[in-house]
Amino acid sequence: MFPMQFTNSAYRQMEPMFAPASRGQVQPYRPRTKRRQEPQVGNAAIAALANQMSALQLQVAGLAGQARVDRRGPRRVQKNKQKKKNSSNGEKPKEKKKKQKQQEKKGSGGEKAKKPRNRPGKEVRISVKRARQSTFPVYHDGAISGYAVLIGSRVFKPAHVKGKFDHPELADIKFQVAEVMDLEAAAYPKCMRDQAAEPATMMDGVYNGEYGNIQEWRTILYSMRAAEASRGDSGRPFTDNSGKVVGIVLGGGPDGRRTRLSVIGFDKKLKAREIAYSEAIPWTRAPALLLLPMVIACTYNSNTFDCSKPSCQDCCITAEPKKAMTMLKDNLNDPNYWDLLIAVTTCSSARKKRAVSTSPVAVYDTQILAAHAAASPYRAYCPDCDGTACISPIAIDEVVSSGSDHVLRIRVGSQSGVTAKGGAAGETSLRYLGRDGKVYAADNTRLVVRTTAKCDVLQATGHYILANCPVGQSLTVAATLDGTRHQCTTVFEHQVTEKFTRERSKGHHLSDLTKKCTRFSTTPKKSALYLVDVYDALPTSVEISTVVTCNERQCTVRVPPGTTVKFDKRCKNAAKETVTFTSDSQTFTCEEPVLTAASITQGKPHLRSSMLPSGGKEVKARIPFPFPPETATCRVSIAPLPSITYEESDVLLAGTAKYPVLLTTRNLGFHSNATSEWIQGKYLRRIPVTPQGIELMLGNNAPLHFWSSVRYASGDADAYPWELLVHHIKHHPEYAWAFVGVACGLLAVAACMFACACNRVRYSLLANTFNPNPPPLTALTAALCCIPGARADQPYLDIIAYLWTNSKVAFGLQCAAPVACMLIVTYALRHCRLCCNSFLGVRGWSALLVILAYVQSCKAYEHTVVVPMDPRAPSYEAVINRNGYDPLKLTIAVNFTVISPTTALEYWTCAGVPVVEPPHVGCCTSVSCPSDLSTLHAFTGKAVSDVHCDVHTNVYPLLWGAAHCFCSTENTQVSAVAATVSEFCAQDSERAEAFSVHSSSVTAEILVTLGEVVTAVHVYVDGVTSARGTDLKIVAGPITTDYSPFDRKVVRIGEEVYNYDWPPYGAGRPGTFGDIQARSTNYVKPNDLYGDIGIEVLQPTNDHVHVAYTYTTSGLLRWLQDAPKPLSVTAPHGCKISANPLLALDCGVGAVPMSINIPDAKFTRKLKDPKPSALKCVVDSCEYGVDYGGAATITYEGHEAGKCGIHSLTPGVPLRTSVVEVVAGANTVKTTFSSPTPEVTLEVEICSAIVKCASECTPPKEHVVAARPRHGSDTGGYISGPAMRWAGRIVGNPSGPVSSSLAVTYCVVKKCRSKRIRIVKS
């Protein structure tokens, strides 16, 4: 049982029942007198008594399941008083007092009742008091519009509550609005922490609210006294018995005889979830203009009344059916039509039997079933009644399927769960129209639904049956009615086209994973969506003997109650006439009567059927529509993960799948090479892993990522060219030897060309003059000026100083272009006879020294880096060593990346269905299609397209039945069919949207950690971002790529996105994607619908009245049958695809250049340099090809105490960088590193001291890892440090180019000044 606590109002309701008698009086026994006739009471009094009884039952049930608590605490011992001694007879005081009480009770006859405590329990009062202390009102326009509650570390209030706090600490707080809930949250000041309530998890049970108890049962919350709540109570908390808050109230609405609530529930970790009721009204105070009283009442004979409380003498459908039907017809558009319908169908004046169960759900279901008394069952044509066509009481009129699951909604002519008079009955009862035109009800009908196998009947309410059926080409409904087995079979192609799913499981799912799904609603609600129109009843043909009995001249007509009998009569010497009878029994006189064409018309309307001729167009009433589609949250299964083992560069998956599970893989590089496979039973799969990484996803489990470490050979892939050549020859010799052969061939060709050129020059005549042609070397030197230099936002001299400090090689290369320019200028000045000695003299060099000195006195330290834009990549780590300062550790990591495309919705599409106008039959006459086909009744209220209307002649010759056509060839029929959207199109998961994609914006968030300070920087693809942290200046961006996984055309359906070249708007074809198109946001009745589903109207057969047509099945379902792969499976670079909004997240592509200016204030100046010495390094263990697979121990002597940064100087061998504390004396540091080769030589720098660590590494146990490795690869993606030094020694020294240029220039000038002619032999 649920724990129960009482409030004051609950005790006041129970007080008269436990009122004690007067003291000292013995109540005599009185025999029970005859019950007097109780006065008639209205519905309001009955409803109030029912509410009190329901509250009393809940309270008694709570007391029955709750143990009695002894509230008597330990006695208080008074000071300075001696305890009383025991009496002389040796009895204890307690026993004596107990005995005395028993004697008093015995003397009074045992009829003395204990006076109850007329107040709630102590626990309840304490919990309510605690909740009030943490609740604060919100004022709007001087009145309380709602409340906010302090729970845990935050303050919560409903988002619809507007206003401000009248509290000094809470007046200026700023709330954050939740995206999917009616909730706002904010942080409150720390000084109010003592007033905050503790959270608790909301489960099934009974809780304490401001206005009584609140009961939760299967995520449905009811309140027995919510009628006392007023506008402005939104946001009030409700607590458990310990005073912990489990949720806040948003509003409520009537649900049967109780009030159902919409709440926000919490758990212990303050995770919120909204339990919403669609008809709940927010309990916030509306603006002043909306506070005017609004009277919504029904009308009858110009009199207004409360729709839920009409006078039963005038409205009861069993007593006055005509008045009741008139009242329903006059109030069809009233917002409270539901209340009126329930009132007129459940207003029996007879005394109701006392029911044991008063569940609100059961009561409401009973009212829904009883509401079918406003309509009558009917008989319609069935094409197959056990082999032959017939007019069946269970004829199948409509079969609806979403196409994505096995559940069918079937409409038949009979009514399930209804008695013959229209009252609520058992589940096996079936109300139907008999062959004689009378309404019957049969119990134990054994209702069966079949396709290729028997279906599971989920629920049957009224005309509708909900069944879970296997796929098939036909549908059969069978039932036993008064001992006769009836069945009806119709052609229906039941196919299940699943949208993209990862698991095909059946049954209950124990996981917590949920997703949006579409299903038929089984909980009727009071809204227009849950109502269906009924029209005038069509006549039912019966045999004349069932209604008329003749005895010679005297004939008696038997008219069933509530019906009209009509037939043709011809007497002797009299013309043929049609007579109508409406009373119960009438007689007439007729000589030699000839009676034909008898029919019975029900007095109550029924549903319109396409298997019957067209009837009246006026809506007479609306009855419950129990199973409309709705979007719900469905739990999905999660398949158990297999055992994962590594073998070389492969991943082995071994496990057992109890049901089909989808296994998808994709590479995390540019080419995704996506694969998908359905597995079931025992399986063993081998999946190769690449160095770029691979993503595995089994069913609905979280994706798994694996990377392959490169298999390294001997030699060094990050060394000098000859070592690099040895490494590649042993790693992949075929490519290495091919490269060597091509290089040798090119070298031989170049040597031959050079020899030929020298030979030609030797035997040629050369005449060189200095003017006007310049020497070749001068032109070649001038070409160096065309080399583009590096550009930056900093001054040029700052860049030169930074290069001089950090990279002498880059400094030399950067100075090559200015030196060439200086040589050219000097050369020009010299030949213009200008003196350049002053430029190259003492003053020039002095100016240069002053500039360099100024550059060295910079006030900030700049650190530049290029970070890969991949959230899965390891973070960048570095130790900043600056002379004279303690080292600082720098970490840069990519938090997330977002690719947001600019989209335009071209149209949406969904499943198209035909809408059929019941046939218009002209007996012995001709009919024609109307000029405006939208005026046809079946098309009104719907958006139609692809409308077809044909007139068929020579139909139904001499047909006996509902058409009553006795002509042979003059009969005509109008058949009209159009295309419209399915009722499932209003659900987001069943609708596909076609987007055109334009440009995309790329954003990334980078976390920069310097010491203990973290700074978040947002960078973009279209510019440079300048950000400031705590004294940091960061310049980042732009992102090096604008890559997007989305094509120019994409399709979004549910939670998946597809790259698909959809047809343009208005160009759809039957059976293809886009056969139904619309742009309007009104998904039920779009005003711009385009449809082409291939409708073709055919000539009807003459066996029954019907509309014959064909059409093509939905193009969207056919497209889904082709099983296209969504982007969540095929997107390159490991992008995560978000459908709504349309985004690509965490794509591992591109890079972000960054520059970090660190001010001097961030550095701590060294007072004493530790000066480590006597460094020794011992490699404890080493495993190459593994992230941080090596371990080393470094020992050294520290001269002074301080801090030193430890990092690796060997490119390609990363070390776990850190800042270590150095003490005077012996020091030991243990660190880890990653080795890319079997032999590793690592240079480690500690402050300014360097130590070498050398060791041989063992092969890795596995070449597959679950995290992206930190060490580099030998794929040639970077230029190694030794190669840069090797090239720098050739061209990097600035003295080399300067001296060589000056020497060559001098020689050229000398040679050019002396004109000489060399004559060679010809």
From Swiss-Prot:
Official protein name in the record: Structural polyprotein
Q: How is it modified after translation?
A: Structural polyprotein: Specific enzymatic cleavages in vivo yield mature proteins. Capsid protein is auto-cleaved during polyprotein translation, unmasking a signal peptide at the N-terminus of the precursor of E3/E2. The remaining polyprotein is then targeted to the host endoplasmic reticulum, where host signal peptidase cleaves it into pE2, 6K and E1 proteins. pE2 is further processed to mature E3 and E2 by host furin in trans-Golgi vesicle.
Residues lipid-modified (S-stearoyl cysteine): C1312
Keyword Lipoprotein carried by entry: yes
**Source organism, top-level taxon:** Viruses
Residue ranges of region Functions as an uncleaved signal peptide for the precursor of protein E3/E2? 284-303
In the record's own words, the domains note is: Structural polyprotein: As soon as the capsid protein has been autocleaved, an internal uncleaved signal peptide directs the remaining polyprotein to the endoplasmic reticulum.
User: What miscellaneous comment appears in this entry?
Assistant: Structural polyprotein: Translated from a subgenomic RNA synthesized during togavirus replication.
What species is this protein from? Alphavirus salmon subtype 2
Where along the chain is the active site annotated?
Answer: H160 (charge relay system), D182 (charge relay system), S234 (charge relay system)
Q: Where is the composition biased (Basic residues)?
A: 73-86
Instruction: Write out the ranges of the annotated region (Binding to the viral RNA).
Output: 101-135
Motif (Nuclear export signal) positions are 165-175
At what residues does the UniProt record annotate the site feature described as Cleavage? W283, T284, R354, A355, A792, D793, A860, Y861
GO molecular function annotation: RNA binding; serine-type endopeptidase activity; structural molecule activity
Here the disulfide bonds are C298-C307, C382-C488, C385-C390, C455-C469, C517-C634, C910-C985, C923-C965, C924-C967, C929-C949, C1135-C1147, C1177-C1253, C1182-C1257, C1204-C1247
**EC no.?**
3.4.21.90
Where the record places motif Nuclear localization signal is: 74-120
Where are the stretches annotated E1 fusion peptide loop? 955-972
Q: Transient transmembrane before p62-6K protein processing: where is this region?
A: 761-785
Skewed-composition ranges (Basic and acidic residues): 101-113
Region Host transcription inhibition: which residues?
Answer: 48-81
**Pfam families in the cross-refs:** Alpha_E1_glycop (PF01589), Alpha_E2_glycop (PF00943), Alpha_E3_glycop (PF01563), Peptidase_S3 (PF00944)
Q: Where is this region: Disordered?
A: 18-41, 61-128
Q: Give residue ranges for domain Peptidase S3.
A: 134-283
Q: Which GO terms describe its cellular component?
A: host cell cytoplasm; host cell nucleus; host cell plasma membrane; membrane; T=4 icosahedral viral capsid; virion membrane
Write down the Gene3D superfamilies for this protein, in alphabetical order.
1.10.287.2230, 2.60.40.350, Alphavirus E2 glycoprotein, A domain (2.60.40.3200), Alphavirus E2 glycoprotein, domain B (2.60.40.4310), Alphavirus E2 glycoprotein, domain C (2.60.40.2400), Tick-borne Encephalitis virus Glycoprotein, domain 1 (2.60.98.10), Trypsin-like serine proteases (2.40.10.10)
